[in-house]
Amino acid sequence: MVDETKLNLIEIVLRAYDPUYSCAAHMIVEDAEGNVVFEIVNDE
């Protein structure tokens, strides 16, 4: 299960890699069963 703490850590890593998320225009994280647990969509 992905809780808010894990989501915050993912966001921190993404911001460290690219503060504008420009390289993560559409990112999906799936669990072992293939269920989407986290998705970023950048419409810019």
UniProtKB/Swiss-Prot annotation:
Cofactor(s), names only, from the UniProt record: Ni(2+)
Residues annotated to bind Ni(2+): U20, C23
InterPro entries reported in the protein's UniProt record: F420-Hydrogenase_large-U (IPR053438), NiFe-Hase_large (IPR029014)
GO MF annotation, one: oxidoreductase activity
Enzyme class: oxidoreductase
Removed propeptide positions: 27-44
Top-level taxon of the source organism: Archaea
Record carries keyword Oxidoreductase: yes
Sorted UniProt keywords: Metal-binding, Nickel, Oxidoreductase, Selenocysteine
EC number: 1.12.99.-
Presence of keyword Ubl conjugation: no
Additional observations: The large subunit of Vhu is split into VhuA and VhuU. Each contributes two ligands to the [NiFeSe] center. The peptide is so short that about 65% of the chains are released from the ribosome before the initiator Met can be removed.
Record family assignment: Belongs to the [NiFe]/[NiFeSe] hydrogenase large subunit family.
Quaternary state and interactors: The F420-non-reducing hydrogenase vhu is composed of four subunits; VhuA, VhuD, VhuG and VhuU.
Protein name as it appears in the record: F420-non-reducing hydrogenase vhu subunit U
Gene behind the chain: vhuU
